[in-house]
């Protein structure tokens, strides 16, 4: 539950203090707008998270974390469980060339265009559903703000993935 792009910034990057300030402002704005975690953590947002994790060949720990977050947010097992995650991983291609299986690290993904670019690619391939975010913008509005670094080869197109499916 952080504003889009702020977690793209590496911990030791000089922009991190400004990102922390922006995160704090987002918390205050969310409180003023009465946006609560349960308004944002929904079956749709959890499925979108599973798609993003799969598209980056993310850690199996993400499965455990997303399931725990779902339960804490009151999302029932029939709305989001390990079977939903499995179904998502079977139809989501790996499009981010990230370690440990790939060539690049998270800071390289940030330099390429970050989470927004990843989501823009997944949105264009109709693999995501629009949902609210912590900022009040929708996921698709955030994805539409993506800026791709010319010549990057970290985040690929779903029609030319590293692997046809995650897993």
Language-model-derived ranges and their functions:
Residues 1-167:
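Catalytic or ion-coupling anion/metal-binding cores of large enzyme and transporter domains
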């Amino acid at each position: 539950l952080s504003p889009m792009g702020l977690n793209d910034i590496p911990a030791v990057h000089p922009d991190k203090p400004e990102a922390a300030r922006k995160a704090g402002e987002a918390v205050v704005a969310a409180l003023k707008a009465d946006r609560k975690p349960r308004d944002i953590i929904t079956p749709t947002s959890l499925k979108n998270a599973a798609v993003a994790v799969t598209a980056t060949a993310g850690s199996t720990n993400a499965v455990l974390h997303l399931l725990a977050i779902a339960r804490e947010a009151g999302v029932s097992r029939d709305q989001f469980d390990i079977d939903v995650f499995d179904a998502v991983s079977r139809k989501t291609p790996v499009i981010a060339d990230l370690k440990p299986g790939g060539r690049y690290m998270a800071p390289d993904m940030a330099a390429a265009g970050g989470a927004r670019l990843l989501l823009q690619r997944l949105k264009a391939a109709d693999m995501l559903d629009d949902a609210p975010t912590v900022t009040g913008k929708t996921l698709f509005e955030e994805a539409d703000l993506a800026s791709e670094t010319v010549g990057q080869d970290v985040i690929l197109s779903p029609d030319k993935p590293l692997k046809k499916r995650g897993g």
